[in-house]
């Protein structure tokens, strides 16, 4: 079984120290992903390949990818994140057989589309 890992995008500044503390408290591995790695697939990142494959369009939104977490551990993490009063991180995903071959850029684009669609739905219901 793969080690429980959270891939971190744009979560490196001091405002994210509480997130790192939560991850350490839960004994989860952290894998910061740099912009020049956005062209690697999520699986390649999980395997800790160090190649650099930049993309044309970088993104700056914070994003998390949960890899190898059980449902219980994921729920524990999300609860701890809410209690830690972290800055909002609307872009979150679980590594799946479908998205593991996507690049970070592709995942970001898909999560942005989904997030925007959800926000439009919420706005339409009010």
Name what the model sees in each region:
Residues 6, 17-18, 28-31, 74, ...:
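Helix-rich interaction surfaces within compact, conserved domain-sized segments
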């Amino acid at each position: 079984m793969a080690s429980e890992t959270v891939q971190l995008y744009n979560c490196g500044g001091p405002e994210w120290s509480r997130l790192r503390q939560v991850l350490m408290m839960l004994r989860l591995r952290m894998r910061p992903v740099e912009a020049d790695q956005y062209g690697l697939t999520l699986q390649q990142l999980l395997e800790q390949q160090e190649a650099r494959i930049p993309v044309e369009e970088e993104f700056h939104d914070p994003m998390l990818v949960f890899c190898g977490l059980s449902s219980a551990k994921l729920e524990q993490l999300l609860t701890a994140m809410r209690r830690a009063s972290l800055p909002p991180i609307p872009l979150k995903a679980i590594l799946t057989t479908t998205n593991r071959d996507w690049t970070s850029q592709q995942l970001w684009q898909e999560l942005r589309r989904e997030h925007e669609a959800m926000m439009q739905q919420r706005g339409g219901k009010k």
